[in-house]
Design a protein with these regions (language model features):
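Intrinsically disordered, low-complexity segments enriched in small residues
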Residues: 1-80, 84-219
Length: 219
């Protein structure tokens, strides 16, 4: 609403494992029951887990949590998306991005490591997801990952999807929530290395998961 950016530590969420745990805990703590999902008081949370961008198989998905736009009870729901948005968020140094309030005009959120800006999106408002991705990639750089909504989200269709990395979707009506906030897209680039406490344990976990994945498809 006032186009400000703040940073909060994630230490209070250590007991809530992964992006799903962090996202749902934030929603539970900060959005009262009965909130209109399309109101400025609702929030939308993009969150990643501790293994994101470490190379562990299946650890690259991103949780997007908000209030349901397509059920009458408006409970907290979460969508899960692949693509590169999760790795970009993690390598930029963030565990979660929480968006609240609503803009009076179309905007997009640009995250370049620690540099966070809210920028005008008039030039791409009304465009589809692919055209928006191409336009913002040309403007900001092709090494940014773009997660965007299209006209369905802008017009608050309850089943509208967010699309990131050109063709990876996230449903649960999250795009309608972004549309209600006049938030056209997240544009994210991360360049920071990811460190783990026990690299050998992570490597062993990756090997184990790869064996299990290959074995489960060896008919």
């Amino acid at each position: 609403t006032d186009k400000t950016v703040s940073v909060s530590p994630t230490d209070p969420y250590k007991e809530y494992l992964g992006g799903m745990g962090i996202a749902n805990k934030i929603m539970y703590d900060e959005v009262p029951a009965g909130t209109d999902p399309l109101s400025p008081e609702n929030k939308i949370v993009f969150a990643v887990g501790p293994l994101t961008a470490t190379g562990v198989p299946l650890a690259g998905r991103t949780t997007i949590a908000s209030l349901s736009t397509y059920t009458t009870d408006h409970q907290v729901v979460d969508a899960h998306t692949g693509g590169m948005i999760g790795a970009a968020i993690k390598k930029a140094g963030w565990d979660a991005i929480v968006i609240e309030g609503a803009s009076d005009e179309p905007v997009y959120l640009k995250i370049d490591d620690d540099d966070v800006e809210i920028k005008p999106a008039d030039q791409v408002w009304g465009q589809g997801t692919r055209a928006t991705t191409e336009a913002l990639s040309r403007k900001e750089g092709t090494d940014f990952c773009v997660a965007t909504i299209g006209p369905a989200g802008e017009n608050l269709l309850p089943y509208a999807c967010i699309i990131n990395s050109r063709n990876h979707s996230a449903g649960a009506g999250a795009a309608a929530v972004m549309g209600s906030k006049k938030l056209k897209a997240l544009v994210v680039r991360g360049s920071q290395p990811i460190y783990v406490a026990d690299p050998q344990e992570v490597a062993d976990l990756s090997d184990y998961m790869l064996r299990e994945i290959v074995g489960s498809n060896n008919n």
